[in-house]
Amino acid sequence: MRMSFFDKVKGALTSGREELTRQVGRYKNKKFMQGTVAVCARIAVASDGVSSEEKQKMIGFLRSSEELKVFDTAEVIEFFNKLVTSFDFDLEIGKGETMKYILALKDQPEAAQLALRVGICR
């Protein structure tokens, strides 16, 4: 009986640690997620428009990325739609809004390059 109590405590601690790690990863990688989604939104709007196929490709990458799979798909889609809507309101506002998130990656060259590759190769 003592062993099962300690197993429960250990399980709770492990679960809490995993959740904390997930939350830290989420905070740490939010800028990368926003930059990647901004590149995807900007290229989608500039090319043939925003189709569900474009969204599926972006979501596929985010789900397969160790750094980004901590984000809820609904949150990513909501952010993508927010950026696309800014283009609908005014083209220059949309460009400025996406560049704000893309330029936030300038201090992380590897992350910036990956965000661009994802957007271009989507």
UniProtKB/Swiss-Prot annotation:
GO terms for biological process: response to tellurium ion. SUPFAM superfamilies: TerB-like. Keywords: Plasmid, Tellurium resistance. CDD domains: terB. Pfam families: TerB (PF05099). InterPro entries: DjlA_N, TerB-like. Not yet known. This is Tellurium resistance protein TerB. The lineage of its organism: Bacteria, Pseudomonadati, Pseudomonadota, Betaproteobacteria, Burkholderiales.
